[in-house]
Regions:
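Amphipathic beta-strand/beta-sheet edge segments enriched in Tyr/Trp
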Residues: 32-52, 166-177
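Glycine-/acidic-rich phosphate or pyrophosphate-binding loops and their flanking alpha/beta elements
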Residues: 67-81
Length: 177
C-alpha cells in the first residue's frame, strides 16, 4: 500500500467525491501479510490504514494461516467526514478495541466485516450468532457514545479445505448510535 488495488479505490473516491473505507489483503513483505482497511479521502489520497489485530481461527475462517496481527495500534483516521475509528471484522468482538478508538477521539466506528453462518450451524445457533453480532455492535455505540457502522459481506463462499461446506454471509449491514 499503495499499489494496484489502492489506485482503483483512490480513483473511485476522487471521481465520486466520497470517503471510502475498504479492506485489502496487504502484502507487506515476503511471508508477512495483513488484513488491512484503507481509508481514502474525497480527493483520492490515502487518509490512513488499520491492520486487523484479532485474527480468528474458527471453522471456515482460517485467517491465522495467512494473516499477521496488526501493529499500527488503535488510532482514529482524520477525514473530511470526521475521525474514523476503523476496525476489521473479528476486532468487533473485543470491547477494548472500540474503547481505545473512542478514547483516542474516534467519532464513528466502522467495521468492514465478513461474518455469516457455517454450513453445519443449526437454526438456533444461527439466530444466537446473528443476535450476538448486532448486540455487540450496538453495545459499542452505546458504551462509547458514538455511531457504529457495521458493513457485512453477502453471498456464499465454499470452504475449499473440506472441513465444512462453507459460509453463507448474512449481509444485514447497519448503523447504530
Amino acid at each position: 500500500i499503495p499499489g494496484p488495488s489502492t489506485e482503483i479505490f483512490s480513483k473511485i473516491a476522487k471521481e465520486n467525491n466520497v470517503v471510502i473505507v475498504t479492506s485489502l489483503f496487504e502484502k507487506r513483505a515476503i511471508g508477512l501479510y495483513h488484513n488491512t482497511a484503507v481509508v481514502f479521502e474525497k480527493d483520492g489520497s490515502i487518509a490512513g490504514k488499520y491492520r486487523k489485530m484479532h485474527i480468528p481461527d474458527d471453522p471456515a475462517y482460517y485467517e491465522k494461516f495467512y494473516f499477521t496481527p496488526g501493529d499500527l495500534g488503535f488510532n482514529p483516521i482524520d477525514t473530511s467526514v470526521g475521525k474514523l475509528g476503523v476496525l476489521v471484522c473479528w476486532d468487533q468482538w473485543y470491547p477494548e478495541a472500540a474503547r481505545l478508538m473512542a478514547l483516542a477521539g474516534a467519532e464513528i466506528l466502522i467495521y468492514p466485516t465478513a461474518i455469516g453462518w457455517e454450513s453445519t450451524d443449526s437454526e438456533e445457533e444461527k439466530l444466537k450468532q446473528f443476535t450476538a453480532w448486532q448486540t455487540v455492535q450496538r453495545g459499542h455505540a452505546v458504551a462509547n457514545g458514538l455511531y457504529v457502522v457495521a458493513v457485512n459481506r453477502v453471498g456464499f463462499e465454499k470452504d475449499w479445505s473440506g472441513v465444512t461446506n462453507g459460509i453463507q454471509f448474512w449481509g444485514q449491514s447497519f448503523i447504530s448510535g
